[in-house]
Every structure is written in C-alpha cells, then in structure tokens.
Amino acid sequence: MAGGREIKTKIKSVQNTRKVTRALEMVSASKIRKAQERMKTSRPYAQAMKQVIGHLAQASTDFQHPFLIEREQVKRVGYIVISSDRGLAGGLNNNLFRKMLGEVRPWQDKGAEIDVVTIGQKASAFFRRVKVNMVGSVTHLGDSPQVEQLIGVIKVMIDAFIEGKVDRVYLVYNRFVNTMTQKASFDQLLPLPAAEHKVAHHDWDYLYEPDAASVLEHVMTRYIESLVYQAVLENVASEHAARMVAMKAASDNANKMIGTLQLVYNKARQAAITQEISEIVSGAAAV
C-alpha cells in the first residue's frame, strides 16, 4: 500500500485536474448558447437561398447550371471536411474521421481518386497523417467564424468541379442535434441533389433581370458558400456541446477517484496508527 504522503500528493493532483475540467465545462456551457444562436440565425438565409435557386432553375428551362448536372462517370471525389481546432471534445472528431474513411473506401474500390479540403486543425493534422491528397486547408476560425474566412477553400472545390477535375463533392461535418447528441453528416454538395433545386409548382411567376440564367449563375456560388458556412456553425455548436459533456464526465470521474484515494488514505493512516499503538504496547510489556 502506498504511503500517506504519496496518496495525499495524488489526491492534490486529481483535485487540480478537476479544477481545470470544471472550468472548461463552464466555459463550453457559456459558449454553446452563443453558438446555437448563430447557428439558428443563419438557417433562414440558407433556406431562402434554396427556394430562390429552385425558382430560378425552373424558370430557366433552356439553361442548366453545371452545379445541377449529374455526371455519368465519377473519377474523382472531393470532400470538404469540417473539424474543431482544439481537442478535449470526447470522440467528436475521431468518430467523424472514422466514418468518413468508411465512406471513402467504396469510391476507392471503384477506382476513384480522393481530394480533401479541411476546415479545422484536427482535420488537417489527421489527413496529413493518413496521407490523403489535401488540396486546401483553413484553421483557427475561432468561436465566431465568418464566411469570408471560408471563401478560399470553398473556391478550390468549386473551381475543381467546374473544370472537371472533381466529379462530385461532399460536405462532412458534425450536425448539432442537441446538447447530448451530435451526428456525423455527409451531405452531397455538388452536383446539388435534385431535391435541393425542386420547388412546389405555383401559379405565380417572377421577372428576373437581366434573365433567370444570369441570376442563377450569380446566386449558385453564394448558396454553396452558405451551406458550408452553416455546416461550420453546426460543427462549432457540436464542439462546445461535446466538450461540455466530456469535461463533466471527467469531473465526475475525478470526484470518484478522489473519494477512492481518500478512502485508501484513511485506511493507510488507520493502519499506521494501529501499528504505532501495537509498538507502544509491546514496548511497555517488555519493560
């Protein structure tokens, strides 16, 4: 059994760790509310853009935007992967990466090449380690990311798709369901799925200046950017939720460990006192 001094040192160490985990839990609990507000605020914009594109696509029947055309043969697949910059978020990032590798494997079995654009330090480090072809990366977006920070890496994939270098693009991120649940999501970004640009038929019509095709050309890129931005906000909220839960679990485990160590310390102290009493009694009997 370890000595009393050694056990007290361990207790002190665990108590210090508990202070850190509690602080991180409280910080994440505070940040998650703001992250949820930003996430909910941006949703109506993406939904409105989706409706606009649906109307434009149906209004311009003689023009089909490249983003809406499904390609017969897929030779190269692009992924925009969103992760956190920091760790201590449980299995949030690793679960996403593991599922993505499972999604990639069938494409590789068909002979398709894989290109990846990463958003977040954890994704960048992971895909460098597994030697996947990274064509773009952005990190350190902070807790309040701006769409301007993402335009560069989004453009990399958009240009590759337009030029025919990539035949399909997926968006990979953690969707925020609630504080306890974050779901790894794989959304097809390009070409846009048919359901994305179909709207219910209405009797009214719109006038577009100069024409529907020109407006669609301009709006389409903004829509793709809004989808990626929304996914980043979802991932930020997921990160804070996962970290809050992970740090609470760590604090609870620290409490249990402190209780166990305290019990061991009390037993060791009791054994030492008992031994001292026995030695005193034995010494007195010898005299």
UniProtKB/Swiss-Prot annotation:
Keywords in alphabetical order: ATP synthesis, Cell inner membrane, Cell membrane, CF(1), Hydrogen ion transport, Ion transport, Membrane, Transport
GO CC terms, sorted: plasma membrane; proton-transporting ATP synthase complex
Signal sequence residues: none
Gene Ontology biological process terms, A to Z: proton motive force-driven plasma membrane ATP synthesis
CDD domains hit by this protein: F1-ATPase_gamma
Predominant location category: membrane
Subcellular locations according to the entry: Cell inner membrane
Residue intervals passing through the bilayer: none
Gene Ontology molecular function: ATP binding; proton-transporting ATP synthase activity, rotational mechanism
Coiled-coil regions listed: none
Protein name, per record: ATP synthase gamma chain
Source species of the chain: Xanthomonas axonopodis pv. citri (strain 306)
